[in-house]
Regions:
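Short, surface-exposed basic-aromatic patches at helix termini and helix-loop junctions that form
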Residues: 19-24, 46-52
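C-terminal catalytic/substrate-binding lobe primarily of soluble NAD(P)-dependent oxidoreductases
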Residues: 49-298
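Short gly/pro/ser/thr-enriched loop/turn and capping motifs at secondary-structure boundaries
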Residues: 8-13, 36-39, 62-68
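Short, glycine/charged-enriched secondary-structure capping and boundary segments
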Residues: 16-19, 44-45, 72-75
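Short alpha-helices
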Residues: 31-43, 48, 242, 246
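Rossmann-fold NAD(P)-binding glycine/threonine-rich loop
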Residues: 5-28
Length: 298
């Protein structure tokens, strides 16, 4: 069997195409079982279980906004400038990415601001980035509207990253050079971002990591959101623990079946969040404490 933490939407499409081969060979493959994708997919499934029909569905993670929005900063520090993760990020904020519009997979430029109204916390904006979640969730959750993966950023960061993406698209800088500029931005790059940041909406009080859906309950429109209230302290552990728990489910036959599956289709949610709660910081007692689901009638 097979489990990975792939966060690239293009290989995800290719791997989903191997579903029949996996079934014929009695192989169970769980793809994208990290933090995002991974936990994000499971939160999205919890959102969809609250709704009778699903119109829009978004998964959201922090770049440099929110309590634990330091993933990119830590990656830069630990790799003295750049890394495979930063190079991959530059690929996903330039060119075009696939996401879901009106229930269909389409290609669009990244770094588009999407405003979400979070029940009880108000509205804030995230920015589209190339990721697997919308492509697998559209099929597994029956989305009729829009779906994308969003990043939470400070306005100046959004301006800087958007400008980097434009320079990549115009052939003025390479993916690799852009990745280096993330860790060591030029004075001109910082100045341009500072001058244009007012045009980029903020995350405001949105939580750092959540799934958000809009749909119907009893023929009435609702917004539902699910977030984790604690997590492991660093990007590597927040990615590794979900993979380890998925492997445990494979070994204990909690995740059963054959074929290629995204996390939302195959993972035992109760067991997963009970286990994840115990390896978070601060540790939580179980699924009921580490997951918070809220909803609001529109």
């Amino acid at each position: 069997h097979y489990v990975d933490i792939c966060d690239d939407w293009e290989p995800t499409i290719e791997m989903m195409g191997l579903d029949q081969d996996a079934q014929l060979n009695d192989v169970l493959a769980i793809i994208g079982m990290g933090a995002s994708p991974g936990i994000s997919n499971l939160l999205a499934r919890l959102v969809c279980e609250e709704l009778e029909t699903v119109e829009d569905l978004f998964t959201v993670w922090p770049v440099d906004a929110g309590e634990r929005g330091d993933a990119i900063e830590k990656a830069v520090q630990e790799n003295k400038g750049t890394s495979g993760a930063i190079i991959h990020w530059m690929q996903q904020i330039s060119g075009e990415i696939d996401l879901i519009e009106n229930g269909k997979q389409v290609s669009r430029p990244p770094m588009q601001a999407i405003e979400l109204q979070y029940p009880g916390l108000g509205s804030g904006s995230g920015y589209t980035v190339g990721h697997p979640e919308p492509l697998t969730l559209a099929k597994s959750m029956g989305i009729s509207g829009n779906s994308a993966n969003l990043m939470l950023m400070q306005s100046a960061t959004a301006a800087f990253i958007t400008n980097l993406g434009k320079r990549i698209n115009q052939g003025k800088t390479s993916i690799e050079d852009a990745a280096l500029q993330v860790g060591s931005p030029s004075p001109m790059g910082k100045l341009k971002a500072a001058l244009s940041q007012s045009r980029y909406p903020k995350a405001n009080d949105l939580p750092p990591f959540f799934a958000w859906g809009k749909g119907t309950i009893n023929n009435e429109q609702f917004v539902v959101a699910a977030r984790i209230t604690s997590s492991p302290p660093a990007m590597d552990s927040a990615t590794a623990w979900p993979l380890a728990i998925a492997l445990q489910q494979l070994l204990e036959s909690r995740a059963e079946g054959v074929g290629v599956h995204a996390p939302e289709k195959i993972i035992d949610l109760g067991h997963f969040f009970d286990a994840f709660a115990k390896c978070s910081e601060p540790p939580m007692s179980g699924a009921d404490e580490i997951v918070e689901i809220v909803r609001e009638k529109l």
